[in-house]
Amino acid sequence: MSTIEERVKKIVAEQLGVKEEEVTNSASFVEDLGADSLDTVELVMALEEEFETEIPDEQAEKITTVQEAIDYINAHAQ
């Protein structure tokens, strides 16, 4: 079983079409990984599905880096 960090990074790489080695913890989805607003919405949906959790819109807007996604999932996933 992969760690949450590994699973988040894999999803980010798949959703944004970047190499996994480009997905660092400090990487910004928009500035570093080239995501647009639609990409970020799809990314949040993929994270919700993978981790069977709901990410409210107001929380999703605050998740702008890989580490913030990891932290949110660690705090809220089942």
UniProtKB/Swiss-Prot annotation:
Main location, first listed in the record: cytoplasm
Keywords for this protein: Cytoplasm, Fatty acid biosynthesis, Fatty acid metabolism, Lipid biosynthesis, Lipid metabolism, Phosphopantetheine, Phosphoprotein
Molecular function as annotated in GO: acyl binding; acyl carrier activity
InterPro entries in alphabetical order: ACP (IPR003231), ACP-like_sf (IPR036736), PP-bd_ACP (IPR009081), Ppantetheine_attach_site (IPR006162)
PROSITE patterns: CARRIER (PS50075), PHOSPHOPANTETHEINE (PS00012)
UniProt domain Carrier: residue ranges: 2-77
Superkingdom, taxonomy of origin: Bacteria
Gene Ontology terms describing biological process: lipid A biosynthetic process
Chain positions with O-(pantetheine 4'-phosphoryl)serine modification: 37
Post-translational modification: 4'-phosphopantetheine is transferred from CoA to a specific serine of apo-ACP by AcpS. This modification is essential for activity because fatty acids are bound in thioester linkage to the sulfhydryl of the prosthetic group.
SUPFAM superfamilies membership: ACP-like (SSF47336)
Pathway named in the protein's UniProt entry: Lipid metabolism; fatty acid biosynthesis
Any one cellular-component term (Gene Ontology): cytosol
Localization (cell): Cytoplasm
HAMAP family: Acyl_carrier (MF_01217)
Function comment: Carrier of the growing fatty acid chain in fatty acid biosynthesis.
Family: Belongs to the acyl carrier protein (ACP) family.
NCBIfam families: acyl_carrier, PRK00982.1-2, PRK00982.1-3, PRK00982.1-4, PRK00982.1-5
Protein's UniProt name: Acyl carrier protein
UniProt source species: Stutzerimonas stutzeri (strain A1501) (Pseudomonas stutzeri)
Gene encoding the protein: acpP
